[in-house]
Amino acid sequence: MSKVLKLTSVTLAASSLAAAGYFYAFDRDSYHYKNASWKRIGDHVQGILDRKEDIAVQRTSSEARDVTVRPIKETMKDLWNEQVRNTAQWVYSFGSNTSTKA
């Protein structure tokens, strides 16, 4: 019985994989394959390498902007404090979720 079960499971797995591959690559004129994000990015990169497409460049603005520069030490301290607050909130959430049964 063990061999029949093993054969059935392998057959089921292979059939599922084949069906998924068929629906991905061939069904509806390869809709999912052609519209996959990794394929679009790959086609775009290939077009750039073949010099058929240009790289999109953002235009720089001529208006002045304020830029805030902070030391990395302050940024790390803020990130640390945020993590401590989130951890404390998570720990205290266990106490608020418990209900007392009378």
Swiss-Prot record:
What quaternary arrangement does the UniProt entry report?
A: Component of the mitochondrial contact site and cristae organizing system (MICOS) complex.
What family does the Swiss-Prot or TrEMBL record give for this protein?
Belongs to the MICOS complex subunit Mic12 family.
According to its UniProt entry, the protein's GO biological process terms are: cristae formation
Name of this protein:
MICOS complex subunit MIC12
Q: Which InterPro entries match?
A: Mic12
- In what way does this protein cross or attach to the membrane? Single-pass membrane protein
UniProt KW keywords:
Membrane, Mitochondrion, Mitochondrion inner membrane, Transmembrane, Transmembrane helix
Cellular localisation: Mitochondrion inner membrane
A GO cellular component annotated for this chain's UniProt record is: MICOS complex
Q: Which Pfam families match?
A: AIM5
Transmembrane annotation, as ranges:
4-26
- Role played: Component of the MICOS complex, a large protein complex of the mitochondrial inner membrane that plays crucial roles in the maintenance of crista junctions, inner membrane architecture, and formation of contact sites to the outer membrane.
